[in-house]
């Protein structure tokens, strides 16, 4: 009903893009995914495992595995 409004016309936006560009909709999604992966990687870099190391393996696990069980919970026969 009001075709003279800027959000219904293709006039340039803040950075020179069209006002109704689909890239402006996908940028927050892609940025959030990349930022989430990057943030989790930076957070987990200095925190490789959450439990103190045992005699061998990578430490105790939360599901009943002892301190000597290797990474993944397999029995230590190798």
Swiss-Prot record:
Localisation: Membrane
Main location: membrane
UniProtKB keywords: Membrane, Transmembrane, Transmembrane helix
Transmembrane segments: 21-43
Membrane topology (UniProt): Single-pass membrane protein
Entry's Gene Ontology cellular component terms: membrane
Protein name as catalogued: Uncharacterized protein YojB
Gene that this polypeptide is encoded by: yojB
């Amino acid at each position: 009903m009001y075709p003279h409004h800027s959000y219904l016309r293709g006039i340039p936006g803040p950075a020179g893009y069209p006002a109704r560009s689909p890239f402006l909709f996908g940028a927050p999604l892609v940025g959030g995914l990349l930022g989430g992966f990057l943030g989790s990687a930076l957070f987990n870099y200095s925190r490789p495992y959450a439990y103190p190391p045992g005699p061998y393996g990578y430490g105790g696990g939360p599901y009943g595995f002892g301190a000597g069980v290797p990474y993944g919970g397999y029995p230590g026969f190798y």
